Amino acid sequence: PGKYSDNRLNATYAFGGFELLDATLTENFGISIDGNLEVDFTGFEAIMDRVGGIDIELTSAEAAYINKRNHTSIVAGLNHLNGAEALTYARARKIDSDFGRTERQRKVLLSMYEQAKNLSVTELLGLMYNILSYITTDLTDSEILSLLYRLLPLASSISINSYTVPADDCYYYASIRGMSVLVPDLPRIRQCLEEYLPLE
């Protein structure tokens, strides 16, 4: 959008923050964004530790990757990861691909949700108070608390699903201006999103 030329989607936040990111998602995918949250690596580690860590099923390659960078002795299988270990897991790309990395990131978020939803209302409010300083957002504190209060009654029964964009058969690989990129089939992606999400 605006003065910017075609580029990787993940460049939009660096170029223009939340405003450009939201405009780009809306223009390309027809999705209206209600609010944004951003956490840096330091904040990510701190939030994970505040939640109490997360349970993640690791492959042998993932366990070896975490061990190499954290001087730990984790083995394949179900592991309880602290903030530093969870960050290493979420950032891992060289053991497979970008698609593998984004899948790990989704697993981290879902596991964190599973961990947090078992907290009491008092514990959740205390957690929110402690982690807000690590979050950059265009939502007000009152909007965040309002969303939290709306979520609390549903937390024990709500089911969260994730969806990857671009989906299979909705892109092709190319080299553009020296960048290795996935070129999206935007009409097909919009169609898939309309089938998956209740878009307005």
Task: Label each residue range with its predicted role.
Residues 1-200:
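Non-catalytic, solvent-exposed segments at the cell envelope interface
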